[in-house]
Amino acid sequence: MYPVDLHMHTVASTHAYSTLHDYIAEAKLKNIKLFAITDHGPDMADAPHYWHFMNMRVWPRLVDGVGILRGIEANIKNLDGDIDCTGPMLDAVDLLIAGFHEPVFPPQDKAANTQAMIATMAQGNVHIISHPGNPKYPVDIPAIAQAAAKYNVALELNNSSFAHSRKGSEANCRAIAAAVRDAGGWLALGSDSHIAYALGIFEHCERIIAEVNFPQERILNVSPRRLLDYLEQRGRPAIPELAEL
């Protein structure tokens, strides 16, 4: 069991079903110490408005011993790697995930998908690429793993990709984990929970990690401190309220 979950959605993304309060309650039950709310970026049809992300400053940092990070799952928009988290929004979030979503960036061929993903990492704002193993978006796996290591970006193992979404992802996810291992990069684990009961569920991710013998010291979710240190190393300000997690 990992004590950190880095990818989940609330009712602010209207195809999800839980509130911030629901996630806090579930985290306490499961001994999750830190989680990031990462609702979809505003270019998605049912995503929160820009103001939602700007107003996350009203959230508490710590509730009943559970740390809360203000995040976004932004959309990769084009081959230049542009995303729908820009300007003041970049300073409003602690954690910036970005990935491909069909309503914003329709699937392309392998070369174009790879170009867009690497360009997104190269822009320097994104911390994690979400569900890079999606078979609808084939990529050059060694190339993206090497780019992720170069730009200090984590690639995600997304538990939902094995259970509910993006059917056929497993072989790609296994290959990505092995490529990140060989490149010396970071893995991030995300439940991609759309309902609080799925918070912290990483059973499929854990199986892949074991199968490829991925080193625990290169997984961001191992402890709150590891994730917070990574974000600070990437230039995010320290969060004093979470210092003791």
UniProtKB/Swiss-Prot annotation:
It holds the Pfam family PHP. Keywords: Hydrolase, Metal-binding, Zinc. InterPro entries: Phosphatase_YcdX_put (IPR023710), PHP_dom (IPR004013), PHP_phosphatase (IPR050243), Pol/His_phosphatase_N (IPR003141), Pol/histidinol_Pase-like (IPR016195). Zn(2+) 3 binds at E73, H101, H131. Its cofactor is Zn(2+). GO terms for molecular function: phosphatase activity; phosphoric ester hydrolase activity; zinc ion binding. Binds 3 Zn(2+) ions per subunit. Zn(2+) 2 binds at H15, H40, H194. SMART domains: POLIIIAc (SM00481). It comes from the Bacteria. GO terms for biological process: bacterial-type flagellum-dependent swarming motility. GO terms for cellular component: cytosol. Zn(2+) 1 binds at H7, H9, E73, D192. Its EC number is 3.1.3.-. Homotrimer. Belongs to the PHP family. This is Probable phosphatase YPO2037/y2275/YP_1880. It comes from Yersinia pestis. The lineage of its organism: Bacteria, Pseudomonadati, Pseudomonadota, Gammaproteobacteria, Enterobacterales.
